[in-house]
Curated annotation (Swiss-Prot):
UniProt organism field: Drosophila yakuba (Fruit fly)
Record's keyword terms, sorted: Differentiation, Sexual differentiation
Keyword Cytoplasm listed: no
Name of protein: Sex-regulated protein janus-B
Recorded family membership: Belongs to the janus family.
A GO biological process held by the record: cell differentiation
PANTHER family, per the entry: BCDNA.GH02250-RELATED, JANUS-A/JANUS-B
Coiled coil segments of this chain: none
Active site: H69 (proton acceptor)
Binding site for substrate: R42, S110, R111, T112
């Protein structure tokens, strides 16, 4: 009888390990942290996570040369929803990407989503190998 009681505890013990090593969570690693274009970009700072696992998220930067931040958000949803990944917008702004001179300027705010943490955005960009050598300035 004691053995059956012990076995009934097994799902509670195994469940946290299943969540940590789930293939859904590993799929977040396959999502590039940065996708921006050259020139003037409207960008969004986004926290992504697998549906139901908000604790195990990842912050990404997405930007494009578009008229408003909602267009950027729509493209993010088109990219992530088929994979079962949810997105929470942390804020937005603008990035001036001068790839030829290896300079970037992060500034401004999104009227729709509010202001992003530009310093955090800069740190994410610096961690990306493409923009590691760029001089990135932040203006609040």
């Amino acid at each position: 009888m004691k053995m059956f009681k012990s076995l009934s505890q097994l799902p509670r013990i195994v469940s946290p390990f299943q969540k940590c090593y789930s293939t859904d969570l590993i799929s977040l690693v396959g999502i590039p942290r940065v996708k921006i274009t050259k020139g003037q970009n409207r960008y969004l700072l986004v926290n992504i996570h697998t549906h139901g696992f908000t604790k195990y998220g990842r912050v990404i930067v997405r930007g494009a040369d578009v008229d408003n931040h909602l267009t950027v958000f729509d493209s993010i949803l088109e990219e992530l929803e088929p994979q079962g990944i949810c997105a929470k917008i942390l804020g937005g702004g603008r990035i001036l990407n001068e790839a030829d001179s290896k300079k970037m300027k992060i500034y401004g705010t999104s009227r729709t989503f509010g202001s992003a943490d530009h310093t955090r955005t800069r740190n994410i960009l610096h961690s990306w190998t493409t923009y590691k050598d760029f001089k990135i300035t932040v203006k609040n």
